[in-house]
Amino acid sequence: MIGPNRGRRVPIVIAAVLAVVAVGFGARGAVAAGPPVTLVAATTYDVLPDEHRIAVTVKVTATSTLKDTITRRFYVDRAYLAVPASATNLRISATSGKPSVTVSSRAAGAAVLLLRCGSQLGAGKSIPLTLTFDIADPGGAPDRALRISPSLVMFSAWGIGATGVSGSTVRVRLPAGYSASIGRGPLTGPVTESDGHLVYASAPLSTPGTFVADLAADRPGLLVDGRGSVSVGAQTVMLNIRAWPDDPDWRARVSDVLTRGLPALGSAIGVGWLIGPTLEVRETISGTAGEAGTGSAGGGSFDAAVGRLDIPYTADPTIILHGAAHAWFNAALVSDRWIAEGFAALATAEAGTALSIAVRSPAMTVEALGHSIPLNAWAVGGPDDDFGYAAALQLARNIEARAGITALRAAWADAAAGTFAYQPTDPLVEGSVDTQEQGAGPVDWRTLLDLIEGQSGRSFDGLWRAWVVRPSDAALLDARVDARALYAATVEAAAPWVLPRSVRDALRTWQFDTATVELQDLMSVIDQRESITRAAAAAGLSPPTALRHVFEGTAGVGAAAAEAVTEQAVIDVFSDVLAAEPTDPSLVITIGLLGTDSQADIVAAREAFAAGDLDATVSHAQAARAVWASAEDVGGRRIISGATLAFAVVVLLWLLVHRRRAPKRKIVRHAHRLEE
């Protein structure tokens, strides 16, 4: 349906002979079995926006269906024709005679005209008549069905002609520059005439008395800007309200509601202005019922890509507020229709209460309940729309009541910031990271459930099962319950360590099988961590931070498990080395250890382990082991060497002593005289 609802046209018998006259004598006249006269009309609706009227021209061909007899001749001189009740300035002309037209009666939104042909129409004869009248814009409420102005044309074009007689046609002529939409009909076109007029036309009509085409046309380039501003929280939003030049009432109405309503909506939602600094508001013929982010049928339509709000010229405060709420709840923030419509309606109602505006909210009816569906199955259009709008609002109210306004606003703040559920940040947990993980896209039914449960600490599983999910979705909720329980247990077991992002991403995308496998593997690593902690303490070692970094990082749980195995192996090596240290060394071993510093290697090994240098840990430990292992051999060799040395010293000393104690030999020197 285009524009305001049109009244249903009631078929009226529109051609009948008022008088059949017989002339002559003899046998009774042979009157046709059907109506004595047929009317075939070519009707042209010439739209004159500047004059606020439509000039209608009806070219009628009246044909007598009577037959003369030998003794009698028959003729007709008048007929009935139905036209819209709004027809004024009725005139009729013919090529001969003096035809006339008067209103015979009015009924069912139509005026029944009495056409006097101005001459006698003999049996089987035809006469062309031209009927003209005006359809004028009556003024009044903006949602009136008939509106003819330079900015907007809205009317219904009737088919005119005799019921049951085919061949009548309908044409609509619009001035250049208009963009038109056609409902019912059908009318084809437009065809551009030489003077620029746009022509829409019907095919020959088989039942003109029931034909009606709804036409709505505007001139997009005719909008006039009107600028202003409004504060939404801490932000200033520039308004550019673009209205038709001849519709100051719409501009004033929309400006008033938006100036007061945007701040109230921001407060109700709890999120600041999300789009660019300027909001363009455009007057249009009608609203659009569409995907997430558009208003309800006949409501405003928001385009997040360009920051434009289209509001129909008929809009009341409810439609204006609801359309403005989609500046938040649009495809940039949410991807599911029920979320956008339900929370937009909730914000509209709460803002209306704050502003003392009587808002019309979707209400659940018995008829709507007859079309109940899971909200995940709600598509655009169709018989379930009434249920969808009412159910979406009711669920939004239930969510707010269960979560509390503070938690709900926090969830929307997360959604607006692109903040994921399952954050690793927790200021009360030692070691928790400082920054939040962001980059999330528009919220769907799964993301919303995660965010709201995360902020409120309450379960919404029951509400989702009752209102949202299709039967095929229920298994996902079952898997989610189990995976979240395992996640909570793993988070608690891992503290103060933070689980790796990969497992949170799996939960965020509802890949519960993947998340479960990874969580189980992480639990195994946590068990390894505890074993490492106990073994390290027993060995006098301080566990390094390497395992935590790998555990929390992006290398994967396999890398963490490998690191844990390696650390445990190094601890085992170190423990074995400690076990090899002589506890009650013999004299030989004690002598072998003289001059060594195996404890320096042990200290160095402990320091290397704490620093995460596992190779150095093993190297220093093995060095200490080597000292202890060789101590007995070294001691033995040292004893032998010492004994040998001692024996040599003893011998040397004996020799020295013996030499000193031996008697001195007397030396006799003889002098010899030399003979000369």
Predicted regions and their residues:
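Selective detector of the "anchor" transmembrane alpha-helix that sits immediately C-terminal
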Residues: 636-660
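C-terminal region of N-terminal signal peptides and the immediate post-cleavage residues
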Residues: 22-36, 631-638, 658-664
